[in-house]
Design a protein with these regions (language model features):
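Short-chain dehydrogenase/reductase
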Residues: 4-7, 11-23, 63-71, 94-95
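Glycine/proline-rich active-site loop of Rossmann-fold NAD(P)-dependent oxidoreductases
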Residues: 20, 43, 55-71, 98-99, ...
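A conserved pocket-lining segment of Rossmann-fold NAD(P)-dependent short-chain dehydrogenase/reductase
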Residues: 8, 42, 49-64, 72-96
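C-terminal substrate-binding subdomain of Rossmann-fold SDR/epimerase-dehydratase oxidoreductases
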Residues: 81, 86-89, 94-187
Length: 187
């Protein structure tokens, strides 16, 4: 099922560890920094963070991240190049396109602090499999060349991640609502 912000908090990658470290550091400075001081006051900073799913952009080339198989597939098809996907066809992860990503940042940052129930928020749009990506890309790029050859090490990392995220808190607290679903992301 969909996971919330308090689940999957024991990452198996340095990337995940660093993301959580930054969240904890932000929470510390926002609530606890300098609390032994006579002049202690909570709220030194107004810390807010978003946990993004895999991001897809038609303009920004992917840089080899583990969720980049989807945008790599798209960019290879647009360039008429063969793409070998490194995850299993049924691998399912959450994604969103860059427009919704940017909109989520703007919405969270412009929301008054007293409207927020937490500091860390999940966002997302759709959760689909690698074969779903291939199929929709083939719909728009009839001559695309996409094959699958699983990289077991990368697959094991992906297998430790959630297939979908619950972003109800973002919807409730700051009216996050993705404009793009899987189908209209590719039009």
């Amino acid at each position: 099922g969909k996971i919330d912000e308090n689940q999957f908090c024991l990452p198996e990658t340095m990337y995940g560890c660093n993301k959580l470290y930054c969240e904890h550091l932000g929470r510390y400075y926002s609530i606890y920094y300098n609390r032994l001081s006579k002049n202690y006051k909570s709220g030194l900073i107004d810390f807010r963070a978003i946990r993004f799913p895999g991001l897809i952009s038609a303009y920004t080339l992917p840089t080899g991240g583990t969720t980049d198989y989807a945008p790599e597939m798209l960019h290879a098809a647009a360039s008429n190049k063969l793409y070998t996907c490194f995850v299993q066809q049924n691998t399912t992860l959450p994604f969103m396109i860059m427009d919704d990503d940017i909109e989520s940042i703007i919405k969270l940052m412009s929301t008054k602090k007293d409207k927020l129930s937490q500091m860390i928020y999940n966002v997302g749009s759709y959760s689909v499999s690698a074969i779903d990506f291939k199929n929709i890309i083939m719909k728009y790029y009839k001559n695309a060349k996409i094959e699958f050859s699983v990289d077991l090490k990368r697959q094991s990392m992906v297998d430790s991640w959630p297939e979908d995220v619950n972003f109800n808190a973002a919807m409730s607290d700051w009216n996050f609502s993705p404009k793009y679903n899987f189908e209209n992301s590719f039009k």
